[in-house]
Amino acid sequence: MIRELEYYGSPTLRRKAEAILEITDEIRQLAQDMYETMVAHKGVGLAAPQVGESVSLFVMCVEGETEDGDLIFCDFPKVYINPVLSNVSEDLVLGREGCLSIPGLRADVYRPRSITVKAINLDGQEFTEHLEGFPARIVMHENDHLNGILYIDKMEEPKDYKKFKSALEKIRRRYNNHITDKAS
């Protein structure tokens, strides 16, 4: 099922997600719904807070990059439950980022070149991955969502910052009727 997205201005996007203690049918369905929502909106990753669920889970559909920089997409979504990042590279790389919760805007963000992520899959199995390049950027971006952080909090200031801030305010106003606060 495609779920409604939370947009910039939603309190859910600024809340630290809660750890998932048990993988239930509801969690499995949430992951499936998130994947369908991500694909429907042409995303490459999606965190649970972006669909109004403040739990520590995100999905991603990129496995890597070719030498030419083309993305290699997964046959099945990767699900990360209660992710923990480590071995964060000191080498920072500037890259453009966007977000389904901030439609139409992109900005440059410095992120580490590589990371290691340890998480749990839908079968309850712990796994560890070392990621570099764009897949690492996606994991860091989605993991930030689980901590109430948006890419705009880390972006390099755009050349026309006033215009960017104005666009953010338009997003907040436009999607205000979609804002939910499920913790209230």
Swiss-Prot record:
SUPFAM superfamilies reported in the protein's UniProt record: Peptide deformylase
Catalyzed reactions per annotation: N-terminal N-formyl-L-methionyl-[peptide] + H2O = N-terminal L-methionyl-[peptide] + formate
InterPro entries per the UniProt record, alphabetical: Peptide_deformylase, Peptide_deformylase_sf
Protein name: Peptide deformylase
EC number: 3.5.1.88
Any GO MF annotation of the entry: metal ion binding
Gene of this entry: def
Role of this protein: Removes the formyl group from the N-terminal Met of newly synthesized proteins. Requires at least a dipeptide for an efficient rate of reaction. N-terminal L-methionine is a prerequisite for activity but the enzyme has broad specificity at other positions.
Keyword Lipid metabolism: no
Cofactor note: Binds 1 Fe(2+) ion.
Active site: 142
Biological process according to GO: co-translational protein modification; translation
Gene3D superfamilies (alphabetical): Peptide deformylase (3.90.45.10)
Family per record: Belongs to the polypeptide deformylase family.
Residues reported to bind Fe cation: 99, 141, 145
Cofactors required: Fe(2+)
Source species: Chlamydia abortus (strain DSM 27085 / S26/3)
Keyword terms of this UniProt record: Hydrolase, Iron, Metal-binding, Protein biosynthesis
HAMAP family, per database record: Pep_deformylase
NCBIfam families, sorted: pept_deformyl, PRK00150.1-3
